[in-house]
Amino acid sequence: MPRFRMTVEYDGGPYVGWQRQENGPSVQGAIEAAVLSLTGETVSIRGAGRTDSGVHAMGQVIHADLSKAWSPYQLQNALNAHLRLAGERVSILDVEAVAEFFDARFSALRRHYLYRIVSRRAPLALEAGKAWWVPKVLDHEVMHAAAQRLVGRHDFSTFRAAHCQANSPVRTLDRLDVTRSGELIEIRATAQSFLHNQIRSFAGTLKLAGEGKWTPDDVEAALEARDRKACGPVAPPDGLYFLQVDYPDVIPDRRRPVTDADDGDNLS
């Protein structure tokens, strides 16, 4: 069957998360319903990452197998029409026909995420639900210095959810940068895969550093504790965005490469 790779944007606010669930609407369910409405086919799509309720995406990547060899342009337009008619907050940004052994999850080399904090006294109006409002002045330079203590290959037990299902807490964090533009603070993270709640745990901990409550040494000590109780508060989902997924130019002809990503990418 023809396999299609799609890049997807969504507002995570109305959904219980990426993954199809019984307790409410999901992004996966919305796209699968659009495919069913368009083609009459019941499909199971796979995403590069399983975001939690309230987490947004600018560049989630999925793949789906369809019986018809659609032109990517027609498939994109048709799916977007069905999503729009259904009132979904989901948009298909790009469609590409790919080899049958491409896998949105297991073929990924790197995943990029963004966490947005608005640091100001006034509550959010336009940005409500799209960023974490912190009514204090945060020192982004201290936050960035603390973030560098987390870069590299570590046991991130401190920064994963208690119910995280990954087999190993060890991950290689390629990048964790903190920048500021006016009242907006951005935390950007890159790795092959992340643990459940890892980035939101980073954001909550780095906020403590920005407030002057923790030093970079305290953040490093929390990492070395390998204990969830040593973590700062978990930041809310509103500020988290799945930005982009990197893939090799040539996808190896194998279904399931053995990498960190074997544990998946169930972060948020």
UniProtKB/Swiss-Prot annotation:
Its EC number is 5.4.99.12. The keyword Cell cycle does not apply. Substrate binds at Y113. One of its GO terms (molecular function) is tRNA pseudouridine(38-40) synthase activity. It holds the Pfam family PseudoU_synth_1. It is an enzyme of class 5 (isomerase). Keywords: Isomerase, tRNA processing. The keyword Isomerase applies. GO terms for biological process: tRNA pseudouridine synthesis. The active site is at D52 (nucleophile). CDD domains: PseudoU_synth_EcTruA (cd02570). It catalyses: uridine(38/39/40) in tRNA = pseudouridine(38/39/40) in tRNA. SUPFAM superfamilies: Pseudouridine synthase. Transmembrane segments: none annotated. Belongs to the tRNA pseudouridine synthase TruA family. Formation of pseudouridine at positions 38, 39 and 40 in the anticodon stem and loop of transfer RNAs. Homodimer. This is tRNA pseudouridine synthase A. It comes from Rhizobium leguminosarum bv. trifolii (strain WSM2304). The gene is truA.
